[in-house]
Amino acid sequence: MKAIILAGGHSVRFGKPKAFAEVNGETFYSRVIKTLESTNMFNEIIISTNAQLATQFKYPNVVIDDENHNDKGPLAGIYTIMKQHPEEELFFVVSVDTPMITGKAVSTLYQFLVSHLIENHLDVAAFKEDGRFIPTIAFYSPNALGAITKALHSDNYSFKNVYHELSTDYLDVRDVDAPSYWYKNINYQHDLDALIQKL
């Protein structure tokens, strides 16, 4: 099972690349890697990013998005890594701007997936908040690759397009025993300031 850290966004709203922003002296991407490593669930953790940022990561497993799908958002990162690892049975996806994700959240979602896998033949297990799904904290089966490819070749790179074609189920973020901010993504500097005040 591989983990994909999505870190290819332009971070326009934040003002600088979010992967290298810091919480308590630790970069977002380092925090996410450390959390994923602590679960002992993954045989490889891969950072998905763009050519401009790739050399700035102090980490060996960095993959640049497929050049045919530049600037097509997070689906391009998932697509690129799934294509490179056709033998893999499952992928966990998390965005780099979710620095407070916990190992407990990852393992809880995995247990949810496994418990529903046989009965529901799930392709995707994701979290949801107030009825809205969070596609960038989710497990994806390789079966999702076809729907992702189709979306990337259309003019709509929305996860909604992908999810409509797949067997998907959701776990509420409140079902995780963790601080209430564990799943929050940081879009603006004031989001980070507010998070730091809570820590």
Curated annotation (Swiss-Prot):
UniProt: GTP binding residues: 6-8, 18, 65, 97
Cofactor needs: Mg(2+)
Record flagged with keyword Metal-binding: yes
A single BP term in Gene Ontology: Mo-molybdopterin cofactor biosynthetic process
Major site of localization recorded for this protein: cytoplasm
EC number: 2.7.7.77
Sites where the protein binds Mg(2+): 97
One GO MF term: nucleotidyltransferase activity
A single GO cellular-component term on record: cytoplasm
Residue intervals passing through the bilayer: none
Places the protein is found: Cytoplasm
UniProt catalytic activity: Mo-molybdopterin + GTP + H(+) = Mo-molybdopterin guanine dinucleotide + diphosphate
Disulphide-bonded residues: none
Enzyme class label: transferase
Family recorded in the similarity comment: Belongs to the MobA family.
Role according to the record: Transfers a GMP moiety from GTP to Mo-molybdopterin (Mo-MPT) cofactor (Moco or molybdenum cofactor) to form Mo-molybdopterin guanine dinucleotide (Mo-MGD) cofactor.
Protein name: Probable molybdenum cofactor guanylyltransferase
Gene: mobA
